Amino acid sequence: MKLDWERTGRRMGFIDLSKYEVWSYDTECTGLQYKVDKVFGFSIATPDGQSGYFDVREQPESLQWLAEQVEPYKGTIVCHNASFDYRMSLHSGIKLPLSQIDDTGIRACCINEHESTIFPWTRGRAGDYSLDYLAKKYVGAQKYAEIYDELAALFGGKATRKTQMPNLYRAPSGLVRKYACPDAELTLELWLEQEELIKKRGLERIVAFERKVMPTLIRTEARGVRVDLDYAEQAIFKMDGVVRENQAKMFALAGREFNPNSPKQVREVFGAKEEGGVWKSRDGTILERTATGNPCLDADALRSMTDPLAAAVLELRSNIKTKDTFLAKHVVEHSVGGRVYPNINQMKGEDGGTGTGRLSYTGPALQQIPSRNKRIAAIIKPAFLPEEGQLWLDSDMASFEVRIFAHLVAAYNPAIAKAYAENPELDLHQWVGDLMGIPRNASYSGQPNAKQMNLGMIFNRGDGAVADSLGMPWEWCEFTDKKGELIRYKKAGREAKSIIAAYHSQIQGVKTLATRAQKIAEERGWIQTAHGRRLRFPNGYKSYKASGILIQATAADENKENWLRIEDALGSDGSMILNTHDSYSMSVDENWKPIWERVKKAVERQTLRVPLLLEFDGVGKNWAEAKGLIDVH
């Protein structure tokens, strides 16, 4: 929706904003780091075509006016990247009412989770979730493009965003106004256009749900996570020793020294050879081709190998990243006042996130802290602390994605729901194994086992990938699809096909779910979760993944529902610290048992076809103690 911004000259005064049902807000800051940088100016736009830039450097009283406007406000305050604007405003003394905030970036992902997806027909081009791109696409307008040239003329350097945006706070208010006012205007125009699209496409439920979740996540971001910086320095020293051990082991397995980050040297040590048009590593693993025709030896390829050298390379890379990027950079270097302030990606956006709605962390990426490698976890996790005078309580959702899978399959197979009703602690892998007469876990490569069968179905890996995970024979095949794209896939051998057929015969509903989801994705172009989240398949692209994506998106929705319930159950007795994988870490009062009981009861709701279980991990003075981890160093 286009509004006439020129007639007011973009010179809004200290007006009464309470008369508007909606207005937009955008901040200009001295930098991007919360608790370090501050707001030096802000812009506001209203639906009657008024907009204005308020320069705090020249009008410090503008902050007081803004505080008086937002405190009692009952309408909608629209931002693009609301978390950033909220936190930077908070550090500058302005507490925006979180219940009144909306975010055009999050709404954009609800409308289309593929803005930044590259499809075969887009020829390598994709959009993004920036205000500039979305405004161009949906309202036919763009940000003030000359700002970088004007800043370069004033301060020197290249006329690029990266070079010039750090200079914005040094620019005169008249120049900042030319940049800032259009940002607020475009944000409001985009929001108004989104309102029409949301109603037209029936997206009200998921948009309302994400808006409800937003305050909980922003509060957690603003609180940050306490860290023990003295211990973090010790952890870096400990990780140095681990990395040296890893390196020595890797060189011994390779029989030579090499650079694990050099594609050429990695190809050489794994003895990649082309046989009959197929690339193979020295352990016989079939490798995909890169665009240049070379063998692909990325992390996925290394994980698929039986060669112990592959695991050694992955371990070394992971531990170097943990030491240098995570501990040294994000924890020690970027902590402020003994806390780190990671960003929680609520949806896919400018800085990461997922189209399924699954949460992730950046700066630092807390979900990347090793959990299965107990040795590394025991070194890293003591650095993370609960709030002063409280304890760290850790909990885990029991087989969370497996239960979501069971919930969806139970719509076509009531026996699964019945089995869970009779035993809420049911192990689905064991249940499937008993039905099929196969073990839960494999005792040797190539042995059919229920766990890998189930995981293959949950993530919709395809028969060939299931065969590969079971250690059974498979081969690469390829075909050209209707659009002329060459598709390569893993084709299962006879033995794997037989066990997969037996699985579908015994475990009714799994194939029905996959077939039905794929059919709807192809015919309608999208499928939908119970919360109303759309998962789109343009031109039916990769519709065979529909059921797996539905499982992931449903799990993401239920995880966000858990956040709401946990925050409500904690009340004033604690707070959420972080959520990694299927775990919830909380800071709680020392009298933690009744608090835990409230949280457990809130999460274990009876709204799905199978029960959800939240299991207690432990409590302690830091994350490691709560997990029962012991540092052997």
Swiss-Prot record:
Catalysed reactions listed for this entry: DNA(n) + a 2'-deoxyribonucleoside 5'-triphosphate = DNA(n+1) + diphosphate; dZTP + DNA(n) = DNA(n)-Z + diphosphate
Gene Ontology terms: biological process: DNA-templated DNA replication; double-strand break repair; viral DNA genome replication
Protein name stated in the entry: DNA polymerase DpoZ
Record flagged with keyword Nucleotidyltransferase: yes
Matching InterPro entries: 3'-5'_exonuclease_dom, DNA-dir_DNA_pol_A_palm_dom, DNA/RNA_pol_sf, DNA_polymerase_A, RNaseH-like_sf, RNaseH_sf
Source superkingdom: Viruses
GO molecular function, one term: 3'-5' exonuclease activity
Claim: Lyase is one of the keywords in the record: no
Keywords recorded for this protein, A-Z: DNA replication, DNA-directed DNA polymerase, Nucleotidyltransferase, Transferase, Viral DNA replication
Assigned protein family: Belongs to the DNA polymerase type-A family. DpoZ subfamily.
Gene behind this protein: dpoZ
Described purpose of this protein according to its UniProt entry: DNA polymerase that preferentially incorporates the non-canonical base aminoadenine/dZTP instead of adenine into the synthesized DNA. More efficient in using dZTP instead of dATP as a substrate. In addition to this preference for dZTP, the phage also encodes a dATP triphosphohydrolase that removes dATP and its precursor dADP from the nucleotide pool of the host.
